[in-house]
């Protein structure tokens, strides 16, 4: 269904209304039928409100099929239509506190509640408050306690029969609990997918090389509307009941909160995040309380729902057009919005990670004006096919960094430009590289790069590195921001007068830091290597490097093959070490530390090579708990026989020795077809009798 023609101005109400109807119907089709929404909720709401206003001002422009006259959507051709016994209507929306106050006043007026001389309601209305789930509305039909049919909302009057798919959702009971069950019960509720289940589903999709879902709502809708119910059964769907259609053969509870309590006794899942409150103040208190906890909830919501609690008062208020007068959906500020992508820059993180950042035309989303949004990495830009000049959907949820969700492809201009990852760091000019099997590109500037400076200095001073006591993050911030320190070597040039001039840095603190810097000049080779902050090189690897080579220069000049001979150094770590020392900036800083800083450590000859044994040239991995040997004892025995004991399984692994509770290493070995031995098999191997 193609996007509507050129947008007419507001000065032409007839054409504008026709365009709005066409645009909303197109969005409805994409949302309900194709399950491929391309218009953010906030944009849809804005267009809908505008159409309502035009039709209110020009009643002659109202058409029977206008989106304002119905709920929206139509049955897909692959499902049998189901006419609802009672329409599944949508709710009127509120976006601001004032909308809620006005709703409460309308309800109070409609119920003839008492007011004082100032017009303030003195007899507050009682409301039931619930969450507004971001899923798919469903009607469940039970006859004499047995589940017989399920249907989607559709256009509110006619939906789609999804009975077989709904049967696969374990949260939905096929038989209700209790003895006096109604002859017929029409339960209204929402099918949704929890955040954790959504993440796992997308992991499975990626592993299978299949398309990932954009969000939990799309995943739930796409899963429910499968023609093959086996596919639905494989999807982690959930359900919450929140309303009622038709009830026959039982008394209707007097209140909405009572209805939900009754549902729980029947075994239907009902969300516990609900409350009964009085008046507008109670409604707003519930809204703001939920808003504060929204991001920590295990599922997506886009607002809360208020309903007059008493059933008799609901009946008195009745319905207007497409929605009940007794209810309101109070929506949170839009988390998604449309805007234009002006440019794509790259940002250098504190660890050298290169992140593409979208520069946007300002847009208000998630309660704030957004001008920049993350694009995560180069692969994400390619996967989403995002280009400079595109109209894009931007998402901002709570304190989460804004991100570009997708491009609106049918709005793409002819001159849209693809993103090209730069080859040099914009901060220091060093080479940008991306290691195999990694999604993140990184600056190789290391100790020299300004963007990485604070993190490099903080790591350099850590207790397990050079142990510079008194050099905390706040002091580092001042030193860098005042351009007093550019590299770790500059730390050893700091004088007393420079330090006491820093904010909140007393004379005693300055003397202590100078003493600490003096002590740090005398360290060990392993600590110095660790202090350099080489990616993938932790304390253990630093010790192995120092032990294997004995001094720093051979490490700096070692080819990758020589690095691979070091215990527990695999291809990725070896490549990282090699690239670090290949960068001239890093070598310069190291020379400054040795010369200007006078940082020293004992050096010696390389460690003697292990004697040639029955396992010379073999790589062995230990995993799990062995019956009689500790991990360290087994390692010593294997190394004494000439084996290299590695920490991870790869194609270069010759044997895996597995004990109890072996985990992913064992699975990886079986996947690669690597021989797996138990402790007895290891002893046989060491005796030279292995095959």
From Swiss-Prot:
SUPFAM superfamilies: BRCT domain, DNA ligase/mRNA capping enzyme, catalytic domain, Nucleic acid-binding proteins, RuvA domain 2-like. The keyword Kinase does not apply. GO terms for biological process: DNA repair; DNA replication. SMART domains: BRCT (SM00292), HhH1 (SM00278), LIGANc (SM00532). Residues 610-691 form the BRCT domain. It is an enzyme of class 6 (ligase). Zn(2+) binds at residues 425, 428, 443, 449. NAD(+) binds at residues 41-45, 90-91, 130, 153, 190, 307, 331. It comes from the Bacteria. It catalyses: NAD(+) + (deoxyribonucleotide)n-3'-hydroxyl + 5'-phospho-(deoxyribonucleotide)m = (deoxyribonucleotide)n+m + AMP + beta-nicotinamide D-nucleotide. GO terms for cellular component: cytosol. One of its GO terms (molecular function) is metal ion binding. DNA ligase that catalyzes the formation of phosphodiester linkages between 5'-phosphoryl and 3'-hydroxyl groups in double-stranded DNA using NAD as a coenzyme and as the energy source for the reaction. It is essential for DNA replication and repair of damaged DNA. Belongs to the NAD-dependent DNA ligase family. LigA subfamily. NCBIfam families: dnlj (TIGR00575), PRK07956.1 (NF005932). This is DNA ligase. It comes from Burkholderia pseudomallei (strain 668).
């Amino acid at each position: 269904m193609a996007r509507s023609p050129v947008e007419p101005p507001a000065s032409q109400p007839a054409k504008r209304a026709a365009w709005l109807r066409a645009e909303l119907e197109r969005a409805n089709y994409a949302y309900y039928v194709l399950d491929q929404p391309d218009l953010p909720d906030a944009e849809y709401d804005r267009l809908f409100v505008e159409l309502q206003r035009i039709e209110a001002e020009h009643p002659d422009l109202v058409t029977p099929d206008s989106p304002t006259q119905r709920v929206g959507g139509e049955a897909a051709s692959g499902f049998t239509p189901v006419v609802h016994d009672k329409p599944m209507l949508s709710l009127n929306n509120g976006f601001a506190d004032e909308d809620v106050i006005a709703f409460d006043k309308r309800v109070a007026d409609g119920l003839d509640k008492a007011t004082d001389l100032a017009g303030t309601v003195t007899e507050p209305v009682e409301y039931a408050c619930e969450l507004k789930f971001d899923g798919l509305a469903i009607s469940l039909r039970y006859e004499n306690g047995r589940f017989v049919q399920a249907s989607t909302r559709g256009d509110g009057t006619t939906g789609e029969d999804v009975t077989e798919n709904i049967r696969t959702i374990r949260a939905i009971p096929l038989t209700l609990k209790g003895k006096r069950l109604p002859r017929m019960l029409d339960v209204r509720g929402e099918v949704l997918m929890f955040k954790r289940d959504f993440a796992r589903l997308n992991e499975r999709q990626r592993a299978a090389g299949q398309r990932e879902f954009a969000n939990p709502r799309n995943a739930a809708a796409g899963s429910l509307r499968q023609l093959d119910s086996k596919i639905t059964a494989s999807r982690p769907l959930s359900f919450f009941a929140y309303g009622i259609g038709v009830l026959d053969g039982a008394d209707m509870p007097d209140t909405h909160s009572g209805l939900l309590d009754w549902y729980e006794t029947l075994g239907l899942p009902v969300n516990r995040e609900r409350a009964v409150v009085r008046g507008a103040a109670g409604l707003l208190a519930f809204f703001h309380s939920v808003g504060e906890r929204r991001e920590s909830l295990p599922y997506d919501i886009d607002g809360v729902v208020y309903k007059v609690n008493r059933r008799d008062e609901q009946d008195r208020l009745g319905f207007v057009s497409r929605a009940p007068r007794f209810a309101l959906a109070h929506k949170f500020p839009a988390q998604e919005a449309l805007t234009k992508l002006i440019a794509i820059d790259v940002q250098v993180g504190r660890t050298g990670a290169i992140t593409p950042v979208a520069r946007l035309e300002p847009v208000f989303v998630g309660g704030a004006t957004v001008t920049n949004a993350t694009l995560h990495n180069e692969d994400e830009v390619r996967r989403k096919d995002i280009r400079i000049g595109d109209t894009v959907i931007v998402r901002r949820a709570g304190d989460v960094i804004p991100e570009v969700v997708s491009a609106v492809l049918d709005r793409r201009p002819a001159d849209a430009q693809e993103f090209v990852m730069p080859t040099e760091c914009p901060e220091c000019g060093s080479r940008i590289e991306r290691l195999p099997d990694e999604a993140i590109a990184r600056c190789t500037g290391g100790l020299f790069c300004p963007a990485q400076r604070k993190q490099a200095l903080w790591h350099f001073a850590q207790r397990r590195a050079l142990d510079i006591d008194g050099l905390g993050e706040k002091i580092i911030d001042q030193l860098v921001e005042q351009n007093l320190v550019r590299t770790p070597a500059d730390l050893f040039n700091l004088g007393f007068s420079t330090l006491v001039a820093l904010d909140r840095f007393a004379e005693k603190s300055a003397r202590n830091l100078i003493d600490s810097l003096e002590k740090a000049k005398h360290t060990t080779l392993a600590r110095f290597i660790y202090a350099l902050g080489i990616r993938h090189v932790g304390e253990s690897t630093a010790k192995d490097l120092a032990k294997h080579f004995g001094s720093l220069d051979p490490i700096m000049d070692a080819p990758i093959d020589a690095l691979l001979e070091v215990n527990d150094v695999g291809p990725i770590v070896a490549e990282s070490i090699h690239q670090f020392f290949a960068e001239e900036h890093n070598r310069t800083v190291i020379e400054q530390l040795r010369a200007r800083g006078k940082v020293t450590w004992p050096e010696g000859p390389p460690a003697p090579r292990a004697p040639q044994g029955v396992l010379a040239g073999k790589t062995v991995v230990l995993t799990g708990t062995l019956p009689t040997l500790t991990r360290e004892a087994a390692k010593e025995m294997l190394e004494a026989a000439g084996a290299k004991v590695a920490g991870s399984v790869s194609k270069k692994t010759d044997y895996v020795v597995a004990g109890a509770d072996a985990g992913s290493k064992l699975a990886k070995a079986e996947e690669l077809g690597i021989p797996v031995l138990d402790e007895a098999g290891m002893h046989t191997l060491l005796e030279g009798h292995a095959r």
